[in-house]
């Protein structure tokens, strides 16, 4: 058994710790609720699109969620559209719609009050 690749990988681990990373900050909210996400205060206003693939289906495309949000930063207020897993550049970083619950189902429509959104902000490096 050749241990050399394993030893090299273990020796490289401390070097990975030296990489500069900025931790992401997240918040989970409903429509109309405001979350502090990094330097932003974000309020989801309206689901513009929810084309996610239903749990019971096999889809070629996973689909997406488009969400209208109000963002307050440094006293300024603006309305933006965020799209699932597509970062939006704001306030020296990126705002991302990182998760949406509940999963879609072909058997029932999701009521607006049932949506939960996970928003994440990552500072630019």
Segments predicted by a language model, with ranges:
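N-terminal secretory signal peptides
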Residues: 24-68
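Bacterial N-terminal signal peptides that target proteins for export
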Residues: 1-8
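C-terminal motif of bacterial Sec signal peptides marking the signal peptidase cleavage site
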Residues: 15-18
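Short Fe-S-cluster ligation motifs
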Residues: 82-105
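Short, exposed beta-strand-loop hairpins at the edges of beta-sheets
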Residues: 104-114, 118-121
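Bacterial signal peptide processing site
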Residues: 20-22
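Extracytoplasmic
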Residues: 37-39, 62-66, 77, 90-92, ...
């Amino acid at each position: 058994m050749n241990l050399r690749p394993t030893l090299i990988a273990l020796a490289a681990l401390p070097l990975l710790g030296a990489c500069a990373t900025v931790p992401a900050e997240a918040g989970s909210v409903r429509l109309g609720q405001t979350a502090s996400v990094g330097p932003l205060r974000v309020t989801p206003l309206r689901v513009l699109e929810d084309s996610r693939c239903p749990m019971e289906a096999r889809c070629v495309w996973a689909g997406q969620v488009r969400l209208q949000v109000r963002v307050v930063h440094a006293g300024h207020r603006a309305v933006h559209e965020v799209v699932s897993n597509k970062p939006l550049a704001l306030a020296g970083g990126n705002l991302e719609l990182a998760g949406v619950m509940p999963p879609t189902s072909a058997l029932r429509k999701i009521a607006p009050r049932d949506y939960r959104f996970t928003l994440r902000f990552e500072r630019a490096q």
